[in-house]
């Protein structure tokens, strides 16, 4: 345990600082914007300091542990810590949240409430990635749901009530299964505990372990999202403000993938061996179905939302591959998509600010009026379709090769999955390039040009996209800069699974 609670500090700073927002004198939201941005940046700098000076990249064990007893009767602890699985996503959370606050600069309606909710989400998402107590993990998982619901209700589009209700129903109902499984695992055996390390060391009857696995899988599949519990995402993205979309695409979806690795894969390995082939099948369905469905979307944000569902399918396939390179690719895909997805939704929002429409047919021919936005949108779309030299290409290639070379499956099964993956990789450029054509090329909408002032990107907007694209290109050129952070941890998980699989009769 640490002398100074480093991880508690980064988790609690945003929400505690947010509680001071009502006392800030402000009329037009200017002071609140700068205050929230300063807190977000301060927390991100603190995260960066911890990673640079306090975290040992060569140590696969849990580090910088904060452990305080909370409710002794059920052995519930405030237990936080970081390792190779959590630190990349904690860095991603700090980075994207800070940029999302800068992206929300034009918001003036209820600015104090808006930025408080952003800071509360910040704490909740950091808490999910840092929690090492399963009940605390559940509380943090729930903490970020309420801010998103309110952000949708107040700052959403015309169908915001429907989208917010659907979001809360899907995610809250899914979360119930986390609570059921958490108490089931904690109460099993002689020593009651929610400590993830202790729970992972328990030996459960295989039928009970499978039951726990299914409960967790339902909740995480909703958050990822995975087919068929994905339908909340396009509706939510379609109605949410684009700064909220940046957090949804950049961080929220990654919570599902992270939890599958941290809990299902790491703590319930026998059940994971049984379910892995089904995860691969669901992953392929995600890739193909969402890519094809994206073609039919007329709303630009819904189209990008379906592309997110498609890209998260690669995470499922990487998790199910039983290979070092496959799991490493899944982690890389989560970080890569977080950056690219946030950039695409931000650009969709800036385009809406100028055209006042999200319908693709109502746009067209605006490239010459907004050349900077056009250039940035094109670059981000190329990154999303996994252009070589971008992070998405490396991530998808690693997942593809990892599953193709897995010795856990028959050659026929591997062949079918990799073939369908390849189809998805081919289809993705078609709908993304089609989106670019509809928005920026073709005949001009004279009514659109007459009503709206199509000014080009501001310095603030260029700065945000540049910040998101620099790591995308950097990781694409030299992926080791990211993979070295978590490779030892993911390799240890795969080695543990291989030992269990070699002694198991499940597969």
Curated annotation (Swiss-Prot):
Documented EC number(s): 7.1.1.-
Molecular function (Gene Ontology), one example: ubiquinone binding
Pfam families: Proton_antipo_M (PF00361)
InterPro entries: NADH_Q_OxRdtase_chain4 (IPR022997), NADH_Q_OxRdtase_chainM/4 (IPR010227), NADH_UbQ_OxRdtase (IPR003918), ND/Mrp_TM (IPR001750)
Annotated GO biological process: ATP synthesis coupled electron transport; electron transport coupled proton transport
Subcellular location, record wording: Plastid, Chloroplast thylakoid membrane
UniProt keyword annotations, A-Z: Chloroplast, Membrane, NAD, NADP, Plastid, Plastoquinone, Quinone, Thylakoid, Translocase, Transmembrane, Transmembrane helix
Origin superkingdom: Eukaryota
A GO cellular component entry from the record: chloroplast thylakoid membrane
Keyword Thylakoid: yes
Membrane-related topology note: Multi-pass membrane protein
HAMAP family with a match to the protein in the record: NDH1_NuoM
Record's protein name: NAD(P)H-quinone oxidoreductase chain 4, chloroplastic
Species in which this protein is naturally found: Mesostigma viride
């Amino acid at each position: 345990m640490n002398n100074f609670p480093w991880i508690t500090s980064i988790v609690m700073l945003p929400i505690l600082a947010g509680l001071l927002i009502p006392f800030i004198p402000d009329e037009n939201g200017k002071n609140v914007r700068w205050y929230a941005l300063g807190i977000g940046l301060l927390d991100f700098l603190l995260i960066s300091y911890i990673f640079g000076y306090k975290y040992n990249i060569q140590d696969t064990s849990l580090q910088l542990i904060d452990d305080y007893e909370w409710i002794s009767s059920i052995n519930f602890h405030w237990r936080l810590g970081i390792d190779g699985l959590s630190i990349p996503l904690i860095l991603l959370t700090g980075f994207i949240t800070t940029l999302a606050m800068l992206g929300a600069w034009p918001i003036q309606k209820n600015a104090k409430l808006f930025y408080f909710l952003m800071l509360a989400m910040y704490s909740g998402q950091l808490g999910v990635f840092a929690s090492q107590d399963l009940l605390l993990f559940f509380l943090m998982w729930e903490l970020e749901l309420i801010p998103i619901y309110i952000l949708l209700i107040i700052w959403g589009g015309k169908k915001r009530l429907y989208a917010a209700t659907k979001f809360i129903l899907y995610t809250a109902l899914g979360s119930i299964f986390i609570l059921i499984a958490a108490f089931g695992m904690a109460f099993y055996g002689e020593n009651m505990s929610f400590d993830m390390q202790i729970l992972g060391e328990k030996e459960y009857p295989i039928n009970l372990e499978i039951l726990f696995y299914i409960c967790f899988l339902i909740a995480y599949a909703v958050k990822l999202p995975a087919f068929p519990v994905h339908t909340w995402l396009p509706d939510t993205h379609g109605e949410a403000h684009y700064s909220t979309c940046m957090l949804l695409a950049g961080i929220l979806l990654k919570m599902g993938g992270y939890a599958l690795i941290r809990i299902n894969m790491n703590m319930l390995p026998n059940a994971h061996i049984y379910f892995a082939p089904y995860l691969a099948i669901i992953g392929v369905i995600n890739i193909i179905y969402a890519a094809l469905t994206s073609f039919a979307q007329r709303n630009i944000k819904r189209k990008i939302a379906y592309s997110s569902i498609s890209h998260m399918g690669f995470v499922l396939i990487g998790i199910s591959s039983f290979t070092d390179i496959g799991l490493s690719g899944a982690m890389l895909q989560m970080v890569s998509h977080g950056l690219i997805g946030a950039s695409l939704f931000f650009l969709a929002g800036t385009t809406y600010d100028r055209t006042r429409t999200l319908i693709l047919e109502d746009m067209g021919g605006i490239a010459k009026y907004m050349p900077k936005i056009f250039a940035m949108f094109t670059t981000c779309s190329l990154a999303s379709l996994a252009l070589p030299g971008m992070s998405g290409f490396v991530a998808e290639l690693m997942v593809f090769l990892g599953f193709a070379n897995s010795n856990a499956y028959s050659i026929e099964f591997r062949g079918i999955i990799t073939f369908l993956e390849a189809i998805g990789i081919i289809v993705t450029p078609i709908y993304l390039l089609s989106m670019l054509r509809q928005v920026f090329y073709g005949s001009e909408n004279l009514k659109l040009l007459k009503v709206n002032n199509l000014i080009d990107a501001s310095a603030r907007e260029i700065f945000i996209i540049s910040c998101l694209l620099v790591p995308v290109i950097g990781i694409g050129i030299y992926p080791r800069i990211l993979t070295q952070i978590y490779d030892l941890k993911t390799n240890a998980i795969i080695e543990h699974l291989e030992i269990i699989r070699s002694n198991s009769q499940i597969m």
